[in-house]
Each structure stands twice: as C-alpha cells, then as structure tokens.
Amino acid sequence: MFLFNILVLHGPNLNLLGLREPGIYGSVTLDNINRLLKQEAEAIGVKISISQSNHEGVLVDLIHSSSEQHQGILINAGAYTHTSVAIRDAISGINIPTVEVHLSNIYSREEFRHHSFIAPVAIGQISGFGSQSYLLGLKAIVNYLKNRGD
C-alpha cells in the first residue's frame, strides 16, 4: 500500500526537453525525468501520476480533479508560472499541498521570469537544480505530508 499519491504536472514545452535550449535546460529528456521520478517514488513508497500538457485548461482540469485521488501536487508549469492566474487559482481552490519546481533558476534568467503566480499558493519552490529539482520537490512534498500533523 502506498503512503501517498502525488500528481506530477509538466507544463508547456517540457515535452521538448533534451532538444530545447540545452544550454539552459540540459540534455535530459522528459522521459528521463519521469523515469527518475518513478524510481524515487518507488524507493520512498509513494505513488505518482504524471501528466504533461501544453494547454492551460488541461492543466487546470487536472488540478481540479486531483482532490479526489491525490494528497499532493508537484508542478513545473513552465511559462505558465509567469502568466497563469488560472493555474494559480486552481491550486488555491483545491487545498492540496503543492510544490513548484523548475529546472533552471528562474531568478537568474530574464526579468519576466522572476515572478511566479504559483509560488504564493505553493508550500515551496525549488529551482535551478536541473532534473534534481523534481526529485528534491518529490521528497519535499512527501516530507511535508508525513509531518504536517506535527
């Protein structure tokens, strides 16, 4: 039996990892990241459900439906981090702990990337560690869920 079920959401253009701007995002593919996440989830005894979409409404719908089966959300909303009030409001409206992750350090990049609509409604944000950002985020959300009653 799994301790928790975590929803992992990848936003727009993350399906192009390994091809898109490797100087910023590295050579790792989304399949590589998903494989690492599945291995880590198994090692720590949690179940993960993984989805990627380039469409804001699809991500909002996935967040809305997560309250029925997930205890936490790990999200890299990609460019929607900086533009989507809809994703921010969806997270705010479901009362499920959420960790925001980014491969690159969004604060060392272009000025328009410095603002996150998601960070204020997330329990935390991890950025700048490449694919490790996802693994750190998964560990963080699970640790939070285990200890939130303390």
From Swiss-Prot:
Keyword annotations from UniProtKB, A to Z: Amino-acid biosynthesis, Aromatic amino acid biosynthesis, Lyase
Catalyzed reaction equations: 3-dehydroquinate = 3-dehydroshikimate + H2O
A single GO BP: aromatic amino acid family biosynthetic process
SUPFAM superfamilies assigned to the protein according to its UniProt record, in alphabetical order: Type II 3-dehydroquinate dehydratase
UniProt-listed Enzyme Commission number(s): 4.2.1.10
Entries under Pfam families matching the protein: DHquinase_II (PF01220)
InterPro entries with a match to the protein in the record: DHquinase_II, DHquinase_II_CS, DHquinase_II_sf
Active site: 25, 102
Pathway: Metabolic intermediate biosynthesis; chorismate biosynthesis; chorismate from D-erythrose 4-phosphate and phosphoenolpyruvate: step 3/7
MF terms in GO: 3-dehydroquinate dehydratase activity
Task of the protein: Catalyzes a trans-dehydration via an enolate intermediate.
Subunit structure: Homododecamer.
Family membership noted in the UniProt record: Belongs to the type-II 3-dehydroquinase family.
HAMAP family in the record: AroQ
The name this protein goes by in its record: 3-dehydroquinate dehydratase
Organism: Trichodesmium erythraeum (strain IMS101)
Name of the gene this protein is made from: aroQ
